[in-house]
Structures are given as structure tokens and as C-alpha cells.
């Protein structure tokens, strides 16, 4: 199957601060099993034979990136981090364009603090979307019962979970289409929290590709502790 997978670029926006972690540094630089979350996220892609290259969006005043082992890796280019995720991703796409990437190239955007992406999920995403006219994302069907809250912290309704999915990353779209969608959102002051939202706003419907539920994003301290315990079991 590897020989049939499409070539792709990876983009990792890593300019956020992760305030909910209440840590002494941005969460992408917290340690897991001897290296940072960002390094683990990069590891998910750098050994893949279909990878064309990686762009990481880093804040201009980031003091941590220069000390990482990947900071001088020739496979990785750096883009300026923006105020919002969409700005950071758009800057990375501009770097790809400057490198000669084409509008028809596939781009996979992945969270810097999502270090547990399985190679099987990455290959599944590439395989299932290789000929898709829009692109799509890894996602997981909702498992728990979902409640809608009122303004007073009480349940106002139970949501039908049969149509609800949790959006994960990577999210895979053509470079040109993603660039146009993000640029249009920024010009129109439309706030999007992931790339699929921008594609949706442009009138297209991304495809959902079911992935593993342990491909979690580290958002709170207990997420990192869960990963530490899980990874300790690998030894």
C-alpha cells in the first residue's frame, strides 16, 4: 500500500501557548518519554516515505525551538507563527509555495501537541483521501452521551450522538484549496479553529476518516499524565 500513497507536505502550527496546561512553557515543549511533544509530533511524519517536507510555524520570540534536535534538520522549514492558528497555517502554506509546492499538492496539518498519531492512521488517511475531490480529516465518532447546557450550568437537552464526531488531526487538503479557504476566512473575520472548518466555510464537505481514539491532543495536565502512563508501558 505504501507505494500507492500520495506524496504530501506536513504543516505543524506550534506558536500557541496552551494556557489551560498552566505550565511554565508552551505545552508543545513539555516532555514526554525523553523529548518534547513537538518532537514526537514531528517523528510521526519524518520517517514516512511519502513525505515531501515539513513546515513548522514558530513564534518569533520562541526560546525553545532552537534547542531541539530538529531545529537544524534540512527536511524542516520554519514559518512565522501568527496570532491565531489560521495565521500560522497560512504562513506555512506561503513557505511551501515559495519552495515550489503546487496548488494540487496534499498538505497534512497536525497539532504540535498531538504526539500519539499511529502510523496506521496516517497511512489510512493518505490512502482513503488520495483521490478525494475535497480532502478530509481523522476523526472519532462520539462515544459518550452528550448534553447541551443552558446559561446556568444545567442540562437543556440531550444531543443525538449518532451524527457527532470529534475532529482530530492530521487534516488533509490540497494546498491551493486550503490557502484560499483560510485567506477568505481571515479577510471575512471568520474565526476557524481547524482547517476543516475553513474548508466547510468555503462550501465544501470534508470527508471523515475514522482513526484511533488514543490520538489525543494534550490540552490539560491529565492528558499528559495519561500519555506518560501509557508510554511507560511500552518499555
Curated annotation (Swiss-Prot):
Q: InterPro entries attached here?
A: IspD (IPR001228), IspD/TarI (IPR034683), IspD/TarI_cytidylyltransf_bact (IPR050088), ISPD_synthase_CS (IPR018294), Nucleotide-diphossugar_trans (IPR029044)
Q: Where is this site: Positions MEP for the nucleophilic attack?
A: 161, 217
Tell me which Gene Ontology terms the entry assigns under biological process. isopentenyl diphosphate biosynthetic process, methylerythritol 4-phosphate pathway
Q: Name one GO molecular function term.
A: 2-C-methyl-D-erythritol 4-phosphate cytidylyltransferase activity
Q: In which pathway does it act?
A: Isoprenoid biosynthesis; isopentenyl diphosphate biosynthesis via DXP pathway; isopentenyl diphosphate from 1-deoxy-D-xylulose 5-phosphate: step 2/6
Keyword list, A-Z:
Isoprene biosynthesis, Nucleotidyltransferase, Transferase
Catalyzed reactions per annotation? 2-C-methyl-D-erythritol 4-phosphate + CTP + H(+) = 4-CDP-2-C-methyl-D-erythritol + diphosphate
Q: Which Gene3D superfamilies match?
A: Spore Coat Polysaccharide Biosynthesis Protein SpsA, Chain A
Pfam families recorded: IspD
EC id: 2.7.7.60
Top-level taxon in the UniProt lineage: Bacteria
Query: At what residues does the UniProt record annotate the site feature described as Transition state stabilizer?
Result: 20, 27
Instruction: Explain the purpose of this protein.
Output: Catalyzes the formation of 4-diphosphocytidyl-2-C-methyl-D-erythritol from CTP and 2-C-methyl-D-erythritol 4-phosphate (MEP).
PANTHER family for the chain: 2-C-METHYL-D-ERYTHRITOL 4-PHOSPHATE CYTIDYLYLTRANSFERASE, CHLOROPLASTIC
Q: Which family does it belong to?
A: Belongs to the IspD/TarI cytidylyltransferase family. IspD subfamily.
Protein's name in the database: 2-C-methyl-D-erythritol 4-phosphate cytidylyltransferase
Q: Which organism is it from?
A: Pseudomonas putida (strain GB-1)
* Primary gene name: ispD
